[in-house]
Amino acid sequence: LEAARQAMDSAGSRQTVAQGKLTLSVPKAVGRFVIHPLMMAFFHRYPQVDVCLRLEDRPLDFIDDGIDLALRITDTPSPGLHGKPLMPIRHVICATEAYLQQHGTPYTPQDLRAHSCISLGETPADARWKFRREGKTETVPTYGRYAANHTAVRLDAVRQHLGIGSLPLFTAREALANGDIVQVLPEWEFISSYSGDLWLLWAGDKHMPARMRAMIDYLSETVPALNAGSTEPAK
């Protein structure tokens, strides 16, 4: 089957028009907030390409899983894969103006001890928030009545004034721009163990079908542009 697929891809690589089905695996939150909003324009640009978007957070085998391209957040891509970083993944902490008016605005990381903080909640370490500013690092144990391991859920909880939540910037960006939420402690960099670069990965450069090259070029153009003019956390 793999030999047949390679033969088809080899034929596809000689085609100048991008066409056929492409399977793209992405982390769930990245798929929802970054990639899915870009797909409509891709379909207009490449009307003969069909896309299967898989939202999944698990290790991949490109051949066994039938994956053409994958996006993963990492600083160390798997050996043997080809790829390129598209954008850095930063995290911020946010709240609504209404929450801050009722409970006060934190001015230092230690002030968070007096607040309800919405964390990832997968391990105890997720409630120990770490910050950096001008070479100084502070770690604060936080408490909150609610934790959730999905970014969309945490964003919704923040919007409902449940507390101060940790969010990837790509999740919070639209709500920040609309004024639905505000960044807390913007002078401090929030250090998350889930940060890194968003890498676009593929198994090999040989006999690359035109549809794969089209998606690589499209994501290389559109994803980095998402950071242009956005509110980045302090470095």
Predicted regions and their residues:
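Central regulatory/effector-binding core of bacterial HTH transcription factors
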Residues: Q19-H82, E232-K235
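A local structural motif
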Residues: Q48-C52, K136-R145
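Secondary-structure junction motif
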Residues: S116-G135
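Flexible hinge/capping segments at coil-to-helix
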Residues: G80-I118
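Alpha-helical "hinge/linker" immediately C-terminal to small N-terminal DNA-binding modules
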Residues: L1-S13
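C-terminal effector-binding regulatory domain of bacterial HTH transcription factors
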Residues: Q48, R173-E174, N178, E187-K235
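Hydrophobic hinge/microswitch elements
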Residues: T139-I191, W202, G229
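Beta->alpha turn/N-cap motifs
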Residues: D57, I73-D75, A95-E97, L167-F170, ...
